[in-house]
Amino acid sequence: MDSKIIVALDYETEAEALSLVDQIDPSLCRLKVGKEMFTTLGTNFVKQLQERKFDVFLDLKFHDIPNTVARAVRSAADLGVWMVDLHASGGLRMMEEAKNILEPYGKDAPILIGVTVLTSMEDLDLLQIGINASPMEQVIRLAHLTQRAGLDGVVCSPQEVEILRKNLGSDFKLVTPGIRPVGSEFGDQRRVMTPSAAVRSGADYLVIGRPITQAENPAEVLRSINASLANI
């Protein structure tokens, strides 16, 4: 099955992460490796996940001068990851160079997505960095810029999914963190939604961490979430 679930691996050690990974089925999810784990464990950890047949979303949110970001994206492609992201606030030229460097990879290129507004940020957070707009307004602005640059989609909170789907079309990928199954705590995510509600709104992929990784039976939780999405 082509699962919509991306499990966020937020662990302090390789042993903890692989203990979880070895309990779940690669046909039921993809895996997200972020800054903490990648900085600690490097490319070898990604390769171990790939050897277990998991698609990997390399969530490093590149944001630098265009040439540097493009080369980093190329390195991610050489690593064979399924998806990689960058900050849309890095600008049009940065995103275009990142997209262009993937042309030689053809169908083997990773999905390239832009990060709009982090789901932990609220109006005051944006104002404090000089952005006089609501999170929704800034997300829409950056999502349009991302599409103009030719990227495959964006990361956005569940509340922005519906309006982005209407504005950006059916082929533009929407990757949604801030997903909490019914009964889960919100944690540090401020704009959240259940898996089924997010998919109904138009999300393509759902990033879920602690509700799965900290569950007593992660495999069962994963199966349950997939089942809840089966008929949507």
UniProtKB/Swiss-Prot annotation:
Belongs to the OMP decarboxylase family. Type 1 subfamily. The lineage of its organism: Bacteria, Pseudomonadati, Pseudomonadota, Gammaproteobacteria, Pasteurellales. This is Orotidine 5'-phosphate decarboxylase. One of its GO terms (molecular function) is orotidine-5'-phosphate decarboxylase activity. It comes from the Bacteria. NCBIfam families: PRK00230.1, pyrF. It catalyses: orotidine 5'-phosphate + H(+) = UMP + CO2. Catalyzes the decarboxylation of orotidine 5'-monophosphate (OMP) to uridine 5'-monophosphate (UMP). One of its GO terms (cellular component) is cytosol. Its EC number is 4.1.1.23. CDD domains: OMP_decarboxylase_like. Disulfide bonds: none annotated. Keywords: Decarboxylase, Lyase, Pyrimidine biosynthesis. SMART domains: OMPdecase (SM00934). HAMAP family: OMPdecase_type1_B.
